[in-house]
Each structure stands twice: as C-alpha cells, then as structure tokens.
Regions:
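Single conserved hydrophobic/aromatic residue that forms the stacking wall/gate
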Residues: 1-8, 12-13
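Charge-mixed, compositionally biased segments that are often intrinsically disordered regulatory tracts
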Residues: 14-51
C-alpha cells in the first residue's frame, strides 16, 4: 500500500502548477497522528484532504475533496475559483450531511492555513474527529490524496485543458469525473469494485 502510494504520488514532485496552502503557523498545527499509517479495516476510519490547483487561459480554480482511505471514495468536494475558507466550509458541510456520525475518525491534511483555521478545527472537534497533519513540506505524508489528484489530472485534465472554455464547463466535467470515479471506476484495492459500491458492501457485512 505504501509503495503504491509513493509511486502514485510522483505528482507531488512533478505537478506543473501545485497549489501551496502553507503560510506558516497561522493557527494551530496538529500532531502527525497518522504518521503514514494508511491502513484501515473499514470505511469511516480515516479521511484525508488537500487542495489542488488547475490552471487555464481564463484563470485558475481549486478542487478541495475529502477521500476515505479505506474505500478511496470521494466523500465530498468543492470546486471554486478562490481557495478560501468558504470552500472548506462547503466541503465539510457536504461530508457531514452525508455522514453525520463519524466519532473517532482520523482526518489528515497538510499544514495548510485552512486546516489550522479555528473553523476547521472546531468543526472536527464538534464531530468528535481526531485531527492529524503532515510534517511541513512533506507530500509523502499525504500521498493517498496526491495519488488521487495525479490520477484525476492524467485522466481528464492534462492534454484536455483547451476543452474547458470556462469555469462552468470545467465544473461540469469535474462533477462527471468524480461521479464516474466513485460509482464506475473499479480499483484493485477495492476488490475490483467502484469505491461507493465497496463502501456499501463493507458496511453491510
């Protein structure tokens, strides 16, 4: 699992337009509870998040998803032309509406300013979630999220940039891709099932 993760996360080294959210200690930095232990025994044990940047001739936009480390499912996501706290609020609202009871879950991220923010920390605390952060500047501590971004960009972004003539057209494509990824794209890790089907099967046993 770790080897596959590290190979897939080559994107964190070669990404042409990586978004850097680290702005120093602007809030509270959480301990690295995860410590590269990506193992799980069931869904809803460990989530991870990050923000990835997409550049076009008409501007930039930012994708902020939450990924379940057991199923690889995208739990919630928000695409915005501004990487701001409102984007994170919408992402969290989507996740907690879908899964309101996540007591004891570990939620991992990098040390981006959004995740140090009092709103983010309090939202996790209110849902009895344990916050974990990567070491500063170490993308391998969050390589599962980096792997997803790399796969997504290879499959629907690199070489296709000119197909997206506006934010609206790209947003529609992102919605379509994540729906496909969650509900149709099979993976070896999920016993050759799409992530959502794997979660549903796991939670029924």
């Amino acid at each position: 699992e770790i080897l596959r993760c590290l190979v897939g996360s080559e994107m964190c080294i070669r990404d042409r337009e990586k978004y850097h959210s680290y702005k120093g200690e602007v809030g509270k930095v959480a301990e690295n509870i995860l410590d590269r232990d990506f193992s799980t025994t069931a869904p809803m044990q460990k989530w991870t998040t990050d923000v990835s940047q997409f550049g076009f001739s008409w501007g930039k936009c930012y994708l902020s998803p939450i990924l379940d480390m057991n199923t690889n499912e995208i739990i919630s996501y928000d695409l915005s032309q501004s990487a701001n706290m409102e984007q994170i609020q919408r992402m969290l609202a989507g996740a907690f509406t879908k899964f309101p009871s996540v007591d004891g879950l570990i939620f991992h991220s990098d040390q981006g300013w959004q995740y140090q923010h009092v709103y983010f920390r309090q939202a996790l605390k209110d849902h009895k979630i344990i916050q974990s952060m990567s070491r500063k500047g170490n993308c391998y501590d969050n390589c599962i999220m980096e792997t997803f971004f790399g796969r997504m960009k290879n499959e629907m972004f690199y070489g296709h940039e000119k197909e997206y003539s506006s934010f609206e057209t790209f947003a529609k494509a992102v919605d379509g891709y994540i729906n496909y990824y969650n509900n149709e794209r099979i993976q070896e890790k999920t016993k050759w099932m799409p992530p959502t089907k794997f979660r549903e099967a796991s939670m029924c046993t």
